Amino acid sequence: MIIIKPTYYKDFKCIAGDCPDSCCQGWEVDADDKSLEFYKTLNPSLEIKQRIDRVLDKDEFDNNIFTLAPKKRCPFLNDENLCDMHIAIGGEHTPFTCRTFPRFIHDFGGTREIGISFSCPVAADMMNNMQGHLQFESEYMDELPTLNDIDAATYIKLKNARQTAFDILASDKHITERLQELLLFAKDLQEELGDCEEANVPISFQDVFRNPELINPEWLEMVDNMQIKPISNTNANENIAAYFIYKYFLDAIFDLDVLSKVKMAVVGVLINTYFGEDAWTVHLWSKETEHSQYNMDRYKKLLKEAQCLKTNSILCMLK
């Protein structure tokens, strides 16, 4: 299997208790089956075993979760913002989500792509301060690929198209010109892949980002204080767009909707520009949206249906 990662990936280090926005607070903690099987083997007299049994529960979808403590804190997060489970039985036995966050993993046949989500403030800060264009490195791992039914021809077409998208973003033009070119490229590519009709649902740009499932009230304050202004021609904005292209572009293999994926990249720069223009802004958006299935499903739907997010509407915002 071929493993692809951004070159900055190896430099990421969790700052644990010093994190300004703990990933152990604000959202549910899923308990995966493999971890649960291990917890069953723990000595019943162990304090950590008893704590696990006390807080283990089911959500409305019958998924195994740990009941959150007050202020939506993970029940194993101690007063120093460190994980008691990690301390007691080792990080390798924490739930899969905890072991991998903020990393994301996408498998496409014999290729695995790995990255770091903006929902981690350290990762967002790394991308915000990174100089130069987003670069990648690859290595071979002796591991069987995950079986999936992707169409090889479509995968190759989209992979080549994604490289074109990266090339557009890496040009010497002003970022607004690059984003316009990127969006028009996606529109043409979408016509080749098949119709993906845009609707005219009346909703304001601000209301798009007033998520029904609120994790951090600070995000809503940012949305309420939106300021429309020109996009800064910075590495940070280029890297924001490149992040979305890397993370989402190839998902079009499954639904042939490449236009929405590219819209997400372009709108990501508008989010940064209108709501705060710093790493914290992008971090909060990511935590609020990318890590809430409800909010993310709503956002993906609006990328197709909202009048303010139609291709021509976004192009007007880029002028």
Predicted regions located by residue number:
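Alpha-helical scaffold elements adjacent to nucleotide-binding pockets in ATP/GTP-utilizing enzyme cores
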Residues: 38, 97-100, 119, 299, ...
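A structured, charge-rich N-terminal accessory region that forms the first stable segment of a protein
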Residues: 21-58
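Internal, well-ordered alpha/beta segment that forms a basic, Gly-enriched binding/recognition surface
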Residues: 81, 89-177
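Gly/Pro-rich turn-and-neighbor structural signature
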Residues: 51-81
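Local cysteine-cluster metal-coordination motifs and their immediate loop/turn environment
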Residues: 11-29, 69-104, 117-124
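Hydrophobic, aromatic-lined core segments that form the binding pocket/scaffold
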Residues: 167-319
